[in-house]
Structure formats: structure tokens, C-alpha cells
């Protein structure tokens, strides 16, 4: 037993640390193998990944195709090929749309950059896709010019309507001023061009094109719409809807159906819109029934409206808008990509005034991605021109089923079902065994390292204690926050379809189309994680800077107040970054209720990821990725310099009485790499698009970085002579206590003269220290181990 106590304690410590490292590495490899095997034996999904072709997506049991394709699997062409007509060249054009020419107006003209002409792709009476004649525009006439012409009547309505259609062909280039001018022009065409039906049909195409502009542009246009051009356009189109006999006009974003009834017609008219393979409106999906007795929705119904007049009327009209962009509300805010359809029913005003009982019944089957959204509530509303906003007066809910939302209103105008959704977030599972073990070992290692560095400061006489303690402290706090706070407590909140607000008395307009469950504690955790991880990287950079001055610049003593300066940088700069980030997001959100989700994610309490690859507005990019990337590039540069000039090369400033072993150099290199945070470069490998490679790097990244605290403990605490000496004393004390408690045998031992020799040889110390040869008043030493 005495011989065992004389064993070199470093061997025992090395064995223990080796076992811990081996266990963690083994768990990591085991988890990686399991994950790869799971990736190989993936169960066959009910719908193959490539079932929907040509950009189609599988939603709610069917393929949603792009405008260029149709059919069950989006395999039937629905566009006109590239074409040339005279001097104009056109790309592919979806059916029902006008395609802009590739030739644009020259610089210096009023419409510089706008297409010179458009061309309609349509379906003939025989079902063939064919191109129509080219419509030319003028490069010296813009929408503001058309406003003047329509007011002064200096040009025909047909010419003005044609010019407006060409100018709005590329909706992505429309500004708020363009939207306001275009709606003004089109509204006056409907009001003044009494006998020019072609001008009005072209104007409908213009409205459809305008509705392709972004929601942000429409919101800005509504703010500057002092003349109420939106309201005027809506009213004029209502009047147009019942004045065209039995004519149907269908554009991708708007459909109009006029109905003329006779004595054989019933008291009700049913207008239906059926689902299709794309989100655009097409003529085959618009149905009318003059003798309907009630609503009769089926699985293909997207919406229906039943107009009850009580007695036969000569004319009525229906209209459906693909989205709500013309109806800019001050009480209801649209923030998601979901398209709120608007449906309108209208009868002649003079006849309506004599009508005592006019009612409208509606049924909606909203199309949205049920994998991402869950319906929370809805309201049956109409557009009130007096307040220029949505109103619920005279409208009520009449119950709903699993698919359909039903409404009833006592008047006719533009109706909608304003829906609010809760996003169906996919909350991640709790940390697995590997992450928990790695974090637990790191937390324990960091805590022991901090205590050791503080308690043995005077004994070791090293100049890096404060930097290492600050680094370990920030890393320790980050690990604790990560383990106990990264998960959002909202994941435990359960919602179901029974939560939908369907009570008639609760017909209240929602504030937004997206409902979020606020969680200020999660936002606070995200801010703290953001701060302490930035602090960790900042101290990584300061550690690299300090070693650079000590080893490469041989700057001893360090500048006066150096510790105070780096402390202000290490703890203060990250606080400024986090504070500016949160303050900027809050200021830019305006009156947005759920501004915090612009800063953090809902799935976990961490920085928000870019939406639609919009990295320019992502806090993750500006307040984390860029600062961390700068620090890592600097650290790696310094790491390479120190490795080449100090660790793996004989330095003239260092003296040693023995040869430095390769093992010693490896440990010194690893020590610096860990403190510099070099392993974080593996995070960039996780951006690889290949799933298998990304998974491998993800596990390697987690393995190295969750155990970073353990690595620091082994390399900066366990390997020091002070720790080994204290650990040796503790082991000897425990061994002595064990010997005293061990019962002695009852047999009296023979008294023999025995001489014992200790044949174990102590291993040579691998801990290197150096002093500068220049005289200095400083007596501190710098250790790389």
C-alpha cells in the first residue's frame, strides 16, 4: 500500500481525465452513428418528396402549383413560351397575365427602366394557349401624366386604360405613389367611361396587376391617399359588377360576375369560388346558380355567398378579390403571408332602397398551410365606407364545422372573414444525454477552474489569471443559462381546434392576423445568452491579444491600467451591442405588439433567424455573427503566429535546461486553441447544404464546444504543479484514512528483517516556464500550459 501511495499522482490524474474524455468522445461517436443510421433507414412518407413537380408544394392534401403549371402533380404547362413580335421580345407568360417586354424605356425618359410593351397570354375558345397582340406603351407618359389626362379628358379612356396597364405590368417596381396614381386613374375610368367597355376590362387587368405589389407598398400608399382613391375605386367596381348583364371577367387577382335574373329565377343567387391547383383565380373556378335554395359547400369549395333578396330582382353582381390590399385597415394589421380574400355582393341601389329584407349568407373554407398555422379566431365583417375600415354591425357568426366558417349579414357590400392564426411552432426536444453530460462537465470544470485560479493566484505568480477567470466566469454563466433557460416555456401550452372563437356574441375584429403568446422571460433569457456569449468571445479575443503582447511583442510589464482597460472592453462592449440591438428593434417596430419576436425566436430563447433569407435585417447577423467572425479571424491569426514562432520553434527569448517534447508542444497548442475559441470555426461548417455532412459537423461542433469548460479545466488546472501537488496531498490523506480504517489480521505477523526498495521512477515534469532575459522589475511568469 505504501508503494501505491508513492505512485506519481499525475499518472492517476491523467487516467481519470482520459477516462472522462473517452466517455464523452464515445457518447458523441455513438450518437453520431445512431443519427446516421436513422438517416439511412427513413420511413417512406405517405406522399413522396417529389410528388409535386415544377416548384409545386404539398399542402392540405393537394399540390399547390405555381402559375406556370397546373394539374394533379403540376405537370401540365400553363404558360406561353418565349416569343418575339417585331422589335419586342417576351419571356414566358403565365396564362391570364400580361407579360412585360424585355425592352425597357431608355434612361432620361419619364418611364426609364419600365417595359415598352406587354402581351397577354390567354386560352382560346377551344382550350388552346395562345398569345394576344402586343400592347405598346409610351416612354414619355407616366401614371401622374395619366391622372392629368383623365381629369382634363385630353385622351380617350381606352388609351389611358391601355397605358395604365402597361405601366403597372411589373408590380415589383411599383412605388406607393404609383399605386395611388394608378388607383385614381382606374377609378375615374370606371366612373367616366360609360360607353367604353373595353377600357373597363383593361382597367380590371390593371387592378389585378396592382394587387401583386407588396403589402408594405400598399400600406405606404394608404397613408398618403388623401383623396381616398382606394375607396372610390372599390365603389366604382361595385357598381360595375351588377351592370354587365351575365358577363364574367376573371383576372388572376380579381373576378367579377354580373347576373341578370328573370321571372324563372328564385329569390336567391349563389356565387361560388372553387379551389384550384394554384392560388390564382381562373374562369373555370367561378360558378353561379340563379335558383339556389341555400349554401351547398363541398370539399372543393373555397368560398360561397348566397344573396337573398326576398323577391326576384333584375340584376345583381358579385366580386372576389384575391387579397385585402385595397382594404387597408387601421384596426386589423396583416403581418403574415396569408391572403385574406374579400367577397362582394351588390344589387342596384334604387332597388335596394325599396328592399326591406336583404341578407347575405357566406361560407369560407380558408386555404392556409395547416402545418405552420393554426386558426385562433375569426370575425365576420364588412367594409364600412363611412369610417373607411372594417365593421361588424349587421354581421354575425353562424357557427362553423371542421372545414367551413359561416357568416350572416343583413346588408350587401364587401365582406370578409378576418382570421387570426397562431403559428404552429415546432419546439425542439429537451437537451439529450450527450448535451447534458457535456454541459455538466463544463460547468463543474469551469467552477473548479475559477476557484483554483483565485485561490492560487499568489502561489503561481501568473499574469493571465484575471483574463482566464473572466473568460471562465462568462462561459459558466452562459452554460447555466443555456441548460436551464434555452427552452421556451410556451412549448408546454397546448392548443386545439376547440379553442377557435365561434360564439356569435364574440364577433370581435382581431388586432392582427397573427397571434403570439408573449413571454418576457424568454426574451430576457435570449438577451442574457446573447450578452454572455458575446462576452465569452470578447474575452477569447482579449486573451489572444494579451498573449500576443507577452510572447510576440515581449511587452513586459504590460501597459499601465491594462487590466482595467480590458475589463471595460470585455464586459462593456458586449453590453453596448446588445443594448443597441434591442433598442433599435424596439424603435423600428413602431406600435408592433410582438416586437420581441423580431429579436428572438419562438422555438428557443435565442436570436431570431433571418426570414426569407433577409440577412440584412437579422439581429443574428449584425449583432452576433459579424462580431464573432471578426474575433475568430483575429484569434486564428494570432494562434498561427504563436504556434509557429513560439511553440514549435526555438525562441531566442526562452531558455530551458531540457529539450521540449512533442507531447508538451501538443498540449501547449491545445491550451491556446481552447482559450482562443478556435473550435467555434466548426459552426461555419454547419452551413453546408449537404444534410449528412452538416449532421456530422453538428455533432463534432457540439462535442467540442459543450465540453470547452472541461477542456479548460484539464489544460489549465489539472496539468499545473500546484493542482497536482494539492491533489496528491488529498489522495495521500484519503489513502491514510483508508489504511487506518482497514482491520488488521488477527494472526501476529512474523518479525522478519525486510528492506524494501521503491523501483517506480517519477515521470519527468512536462510543465515549462520561461523568463525574459532582460532585467525587469516584474517577477510574474507566463505559462502556456
From Swiss-Prot:
Q: Please report the name of this protein according to its UniProt entry.
A: Adhesion G-protein coupled receptor G7
- Could you tell me which residue ranges the GAIN-B domain spans? 271-425
Tell me one GO biological process term: cell surface receptor signaling pathway
What GO cellular component is one of the record's annotations? Answer: membrane
Kindly list every residue the record annotates as glycosylated: 82, 122, 133, 152, 159, 178, 195, 239, 289, 348, 400, 408
**Membrane protein topology class:** Multi-pass membrane protein
Please indicate if the UniProt record lists Kinase as a keyword: no
Question: In which domain of life is the source organism classified?
Answer: Eukaryota
Q: Does the keyword Chaperone apply?
A: no
Q: InterPro entries, alphabetically?
A: ADGR_G7 (IPR053066), GAIN_B (IPR057244), GAIN_dom_sf (IPR046338), GPCR_2-like_7TM (IPR017981), GPCR_2_secretin-like (IPR000832), GPR128_7tmB2 (IPR047938), GPR128_GAIN_subdom_A (IPR053985), GPR128_GAIN_subdom_B (IPR053986)
Q: What is the lineage of its organism?
A: Eukaryota, Metazoa, Chordata, Craniata, Vertebrata
> What does this chain do?
Orphan receptor.
Q: Where is this region: GPS?
A: 380-425
* Xref: CDD domains: 7tmB2_GPR128
Disulfide connectivity? 380-407, 395-409
Membrane-crossing residues?
Answer: 436-456, 466-486, 524-544, 562-582, 624-644, 669-689, 695-715
- Free-text tissue specificity from the UniProt record: Selectively expressed in the intestinal tissues.
Output the Gene Ontology terms for molecular function: G protein-coupled receptor activity
Cellular compartment(s): Membrane
What's the family? Answer: Belongs to the G-protein coupled receptor 2 family. Adhesion G-protein coupled receptor (ADGR) subfamily.
Question: What PROSITE patterns does the record point to?
Answer: G_PROTEIN_RECEP_F2_4, GAIN_B
Q: Ranges in the Cytoplasmic compartment?
A: 457-465, 545-561, 645-668, 716-785
Which residues are exposed on the Extracellular face of the membrane?
Answer: 27-435, 487-523, 583-623, 690-694
Signal peptide range equals: 1-26
Knockout consequences: Deficient mice exhibit less body weight gain and an increase in intestinal contraction frequency.
Which keywords does this chain's UniProt record carry?
A: Disulfide bond, G-protein coupled receptor, Glycoprotein, Membrane, Receptor, Signal, Transducer, Transmembrane, Transmembrane helix
